[in-house]
Amino acid sequence: MNTQKRQQIRTEIRKIRANLTALQQHQAEQSVTQHALNLIEQRQAKNIALYFSFDGEISTKALIQSLWMQNKNVYLPVLHPFTKHYLLFLRYLPDTPMKQNQFGIWEPKLNVQNVLPLNELDILFTPLVAFDKKGNRLGMGGGFYDRTLQNWQNKSFIPVGLAYQCQQVENLPTEHWDVPLFDILVG
């Protein structure tokens, strides 16, 4: 029952998100970027993991540009080449060679010299499809971030979701593997 309900929420929220106007998207991106920069400053974060927006997710382009201007280290997720459904985080610079992964998402070409261990991240910003007030997130269904975020409380980083207001639902049905986020920044 939970699986069916979760898939229904994914479908509904993705449809709502796809219907946002360009102006709504831009305003939300500006708002979330400012919230994220404030959080980064408060936590004195230096190593920040982000993602390239996909399928209508809130854009991270302005945030990435701002972080580069502040000399912060930006990392993007890469599908782990050997451990299925896990992510690695690679340093991302303006000249980093990129490729599309099996899902059509742009990621840095794997270079082990650019991999940062999770314990060295300060903030890990995550995409999401839906969220609730308790910090529960619903992703695309692959479990990549749930696996990556397991036991995040024992690591040095905090996981923070980035979302549009329209992605909030009253109560998300959860599974035992779901990992609530430290915070969700909404635009």
UniProtKB/Swiss-Prot annotation:
The keyword Glycoprotein does not apply. Its EC number is 6.3.3.2. GO terms for cellular component: cytoplasm. GO terms for molecular function: 5-formyltetrahydrofolate cyclo-ligase activity; ATP binding. It holds the Pfam family 5-FTHF_cyc-lig. It catalyses: (6S)-5-formyl-5,6,7,8-tetrahydrofolate + ATP = (6R)-5,10-methenyltetrahydrofolate + ADP + phosphate. Keywords: ATP-binding, Ligase, Nucleotide-binding. InterPro entries: FTHF_cligase, FTHF_cligase-like_sf, NagB/RpiA_transferase-like. It comes from the Bacteria. GO terms for biological process: folic acid-containing compound biosynthetic process; tetrahydrofolate interconversion. ATP binds at residues 6-10, 139-146, 178. Pathway: One-carbon metabolism; tetrahydrofolate interconversion. It is an enzyme of class 6 (ligase). Belongs to the 5-formyltetrahydrofolate cyclo-ligase family. Involved in the removal of 5-formyltetrahydrofolate. In vitro, it is a potent inhibitor of various folate-dependent enzymes in the C1 metabolism network and in vivo it might function as a folate storage. 5-formyltetrahydrofolate is also used as an antifolate rescue agent in cancer chemotherapy. Catalyzes the irreversible ATP-dependent transformation of 5-formyltetrahydrofolate (5-CHO-THF) to form 5,10-methenyltetrahydrofolate (5,10-CH=THF). The reverse reaction is catalyzed by the serine hydroxymethyltransferase GlyA (SHMT). This is 5-formyltetrahydrofolate cyclo-ligase. It comes from Haemophilus influenzae (strain ATCC 51907 / DSM 11121 / KW20 / Rd).
